[in-house]
Amino acid sequence: MDTGGQHWGKVIWHAYEHLQVPVSETDFRDAYVHAERTLGKNPIIQPDFTFYKTLETKIRLQLEYLQTSYITPLTSYILPLTSHLYEATVAETSKSREVLLSLKKQYPMVLVSNFYGNIATVLKEFKLDGIFDTIIESAVVGVRKPDPQIFTLGVEALGMQPDEVVVVGDSMDKDIIPASKAGCHTVWFKGEGWTNDPVDESPAGKVITDLTQLLVNSE
């Protein structure tokens, strides 16, 4: 919905490359994991944080972590990276919004997300509020992907049976496999992954590479 099917880590790394941040990809990956774990364990992101502020917080944590291993000052890249990534996210979510609005005319929809408790603020920021009938947010419900239970909560919110529900996700491990275990049909939004290792596509009911393909499949 916000990255065109790409893993967020790869999206951020490509921004580092674009802005020529002088760090190695190996070190960046360590910093990315550090920042995600830090945010997952500590209530740093508040309910009123916009996506811009959330993104800036992530980038700051990454660069502060990297700074311990590099002599070159890195914090000057915080704002350029945040602005570059935010601009790309605005463009991507704008395209996704049109697809979601079309789907909403035909189907009830629930958003299931591993997020920090500020998803309502972020959806409003990107004019995506009101599209989903219910939001299942990990920080609120206390269950995270890849636990199939979080998808079961989504099914229950719809008041439907699992085999009546289609889950669309960009992660094979965190979306498609657990959603299948929950009994749902699945569509894998395939994009650039966190690693370059080949991924077995067989667990997915369907595979798409562009969100607009959902409109064709829904006809």
Predicted segment positions?
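Asp-based, Mg2+/Mn2+-dependent phosphohydrolase catalytic module
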Residues: 3, 26, 68-77, 97, ...
